[in-house]
Amino acid sequence: IGHSYTDDRFAQNWLGARAAGIFRAAYHVLRPDHDPVAQIDRFASVVGEAGDLPHVLDVELTGEQPDRVIRERTLACLRELEGRFGRKPLVYTADWFWTPHIGAQPGVADYDLWVAHYYWPTVQEPKVPAGWSTWRLWQHSNRGQVAGIPARVDLDFFGGTMEELIAYAGGDPNPPPPPGIEPRVRNLERWAGELDAWARGQGYDGVRPTGIG
């Protein structure tokens, strides 16, 4: 989502991701040459709700503006996003842009960093922009391949465990078992026992088929 552009499949993908159980967040591409409040007004009208993950401010354009304006409007957009959705947004950027144009600003480390630095594994650790000491997400490639998607895609690492990612998205990393799970487990145990008895009758010794070294 940008100052005047929205992916024509955004609404479809937004609803589809929820239906598929995929953690969701939307990102706004900052235009430093436009009013920050108007930009976030438009973003909020398109997205309409908070995501599972924090929404994202994509900071990598100058808009042919001086660094002072880029800094001011970046920080203003971050404040606006937090005010609209009740959660500090992620900052998506790269050292090559952030450090020379914005630099180490007071309080910026309060916003989690989604850093872009290609290409892992040649690059073992991303270069973190001024103002942060660590990252929450690392976009390590823009040439990835994912089953079911013919085009190249971006790939990312999360700086934590799966349980920490679930908690970050507001979920319970240790949810209770779904209703009716115990009868299904008992059925699986019974079927496994029947399969084991049959396999042992065919010469299986519990480790490998007889005669195979």
How would you describe each model-predicted region?
Residues 18-21, 47, 51, 82-85, ...:
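Sec/Tat-exported extracytoplasmic proteins
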